[in-house]
């Protein structure tokens, strides 16, 4: 990330992970808007539907993380921002309350996640412009859909915890 940010003179970026198939472009835009208002180091979306938003990161803060980290395994990099006390952390602002759900899993890690996404995407005429609100509305109307994969959420969270390491110099 740092190499790309430096090469293209980027001051701030929002990540969108490849396994978050329904990452919400509107939420990503909110991350950019918030940075331009506040210039914080790190923006997170605690409590948002899993897979709808990841993080907004300032290049200046990322450079500092790269200087202090003592590991090349940084897949679970957020702890370098949130647990070191070195950075200004903000929660994503101006988000619809509908997007705050802890009972929906929108990330692709297991076979049943694929089945979940397949069901979601085939439920809409235009699956290429879905918002988190659209998905939540569908799942409210058809709650059995979220049961396809939500049982995997605790296993996934534990796996994330097991892979998270904070190693500083």
Regions found by a protein language model. Name each.
Residues 13-14:
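Short aromatic/hydrophobic "clamp" motif used to bind/position activated sugar donors
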Residues 20, 54, 70, 105-106:
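A residue-level structural signature of the nucleotidyltransferase/glycosyltransferase Rossmann-like core
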Residues 80-169:
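Conserved alpha/beta core of the MobA/IspD/sugar-nucleotide pyrophosphorylase nucleotidyltransferase superfamily
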């Amino acid at each position: 990330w740092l190499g790309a940010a430096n090469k293209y003179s980027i001051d701030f970026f929002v990540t969108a992970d490849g396994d978050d198939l329904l990452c919400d472009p509107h939420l990503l835009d909110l991350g950019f808007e918030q940075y331009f208002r506040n210039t914080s180091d790190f923006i997170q979306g605690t409590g948002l539907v899993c897979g709808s938003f990841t993080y907004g990161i300032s290049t200046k803060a990322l450079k500092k993380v790269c200087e202090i980290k003592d590991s090349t395994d940084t897949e679970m990099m957020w702890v370098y921002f949130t647990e070191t006390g070195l950075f200004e952390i903000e929660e994503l602002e101006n988000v619809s309350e509908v997007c705050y759900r802890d009972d929906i899993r929108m990330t692709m890690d297991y076979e049943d996640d694929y089945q979940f996404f397949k069901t979601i995407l085939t439920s809409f005429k235009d699956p290429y412009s879905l918002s988190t609100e659209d998905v939540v509305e569908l799942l409210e109307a058809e709650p059995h859909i979220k049961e396809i994969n939500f049982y995997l959420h605790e296993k996934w969270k534990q796996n994330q915890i097991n892979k998270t390491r904070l190693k500083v110099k």
